[in-house]
Structures are given as C-alpha cells and as structure tokens.
Amino acid sequence: MEPRWVVVAAVALVVLALALVLALRRRSRPPRAVVAAAPPPTATDRLRRGLVATRERLLGQLDAVLARGPDDADRVYPELEEALVAADVGVRTAGELVARVRGRVGRGGDAGGIRAAVRDEVAAILGADSPPAPTARPWVVLVLGVNGVGKTTTIGKLAALHAAAGRRVLMVAGDTFRAAAIDQLGIWAERTGAELVRQGPGANPAAVAFDGMKAAIARGVDVVLVDTAGRLHTRANLMEELRKMQRVVAREVAGASHETLLVLDATTGQNAIAQARTFTDAIGVTGIVLTKLDGTARGGVVIAIRKETGLPIRYVGVGEAVDDLRPFDAGQFTAALFDGDRGGAKGSVFS
C-alpha cells in the first residue's frame, strides 16, 4: 500500500494542472466588447420620430415637385401648393406661403433655394412662442377639448412636466360626466405625485372647480390643472357650462385662469381649426395642445392652426410615453420636419 504522502502529492498535482488549464483558457479568450450605451433621445429626436409620416408625405411630394426640369417652371409653384395642401397645411395657408416663397425666389432659383425658402416661411408662421412660465401662485390652467382628443391624458402629462420642474401640482377632476375620467386622473395623481380634488360622477363641474380653487389656496400649490368634460364644440349649452367654470375660477383666484388650453387631435386635420375657432369665440382660448402627431401624415395642420387662428402652439404630443408631450419649440419643429429628410432634390429647377 502506497504511503499517504504519495496520494496527497498526486491530488495536489491534479489540482495544479486543472488550475493551469483554466488560466490558459481565460487568457486565450478574446476580451469582451464593451458596448457604449446609446445616448437618450433629444427633444428634436422625439419630434423627428413622431413626424416621420408627415415628413415623408410633405418632403416626398416637395422633392418630386422640385425635381422638375426647366420646361416645367410654370408648374412648380402650383404643384408646390398642392403638396402643402396634401399635408393639411390648408388651402389658404398654402396659397399665402407659396406666394411668399415665389416672391422671394422668383424664377431664377434652384431646388435648394426653394426648399430653404419654404422652411423659412414655415418657421416664420410658427413664430417663437413657448409656454409661459408660471408667474402667479397658484397658476391655474383650464384644459378644454372634445371627446377623444386625449385631454385627460394630456393633463396627466402636464402634471408630470410641472412636477419635473419642481412645482407642486393640484389636479381638479372637473369632467364629472365620465367616471372613467375621474379614475384616470386619480391614477395620474399617484403616478406624478400630484394632489387631486374630485367629487362623484354627476357632480356639478363648477362646484368641483370651486373646491379645487379653495384647496389650491389652502395648500399653497404652485400649479392647478382643471379638467373639463369633453363636449361637441357646436353645443351651446355645454359651452355655457365651461363659461360658468371659468367665472368660478376667476372669482376665487385673481387673474385666473392664467392659461386656457385647447387640446386638439392632429389626425382630425382641418376640423381641428373649426374646433379652435368655436372654442376661442366661446371661452377665449390662449393656447393649443396638439396630440397624436405621431399617428398621422397630416402634421401640417400645426402650421394651419397657427396661421389661421393666431393661437400659439403650447405643447405637442408625439407618442404615448409621458415625456412625449413636450413644450412646443418652433425651431425644433421646423428642424424635425425639414432636416430629417433624405437630402432633397438637387439641381436647377428653373432656367
């Protein structure tokens, strides 16, 4: 029988051999590639992504028009106008825009010059307005819109924006005709850390607004977002209810409402302009929130709304995520609409 030390030595040699083999295997493996994390999308990236359908329609037709040869000089501007109308810029706005482009470029311009002129004119129409920073406390925002435009969701996302800026937010569930709207605001209140004033379904909306203003003052909140019932813009009696809420808010908080935002669905195209005019005549809208821009090729309606109503675009929605509702920036919007394309038509358009 072999001595014990021989067995121990053999086991030790086996262990050392295994360790050596494993070490050699590790050395022979290629180093793992380190993949850098992609940077988060910028606001312009999100807009560009949301406007892809509009951009493809508008720039696709624009490029086709600008690719015309010298013999087609007289057709370029009428077809340019048709391309803008197809993107829901609107007949009147498209006509005025093309007239200004023609006045700037004339018959001697090339494709690049016309494209740049269209871009500049769109930027000029959209202007440089941005949502005003709250200057009063509480800063009261009344939110209006017909059913189905995403009004209550917009209020939740506005609460998230203000909360991210360090503001204390109170939401008022003034849409008492829909129990689901009250419950939905409750979910958004929990999600954003906002406070909520609510009553049961069927309660008087003006009474809920009254409670909301009293609570806002007592609690010292910074921003109050007041939901209202969705209604057809052609129903006079329902519009009178909105005016009553507005009077209650103004009586309880000096200077309120400080903003009256109308939420419009971009997919409705030119009908959104009719809604904006009617609500403005009845209530006095101060700004537009345009939702669902990511779901339509009719995003040119942004230009038409701004031009034909004179109302500033305050926010745009380009997706379902909370941060896909962004303060409107005319420069970012124009860049997303015109600069995210395939490079555009090249060469001379006119002789």
Q: What are the functions of these language-model segments?
A:
Residues 229-231:
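Short glycine-rich anion-binding loops that position phosphate/pyrophosphate groups of nucleotides
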Residues 1-13:
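Feature marks short, highly hydrophobic, charge-poor N-terminal signal-anchor/signal peptide-like helices
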Residues 184, 204-219, 233-344:
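Conserved catalytic-core segment of NTP-binding enzymes
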Residues 41-226:
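Primarily NTPase-proximal linker/entry elements flanking Walker-type ATP/GTP-binding cores
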Residues 27-49:
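Short juxtamembrane segments adjacent to a transmembrane helix
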Residues 225-227, 263-264:
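Structural recognition of the conserved hydrophobic beta-strand(s) that form the central parallel beta-sheet
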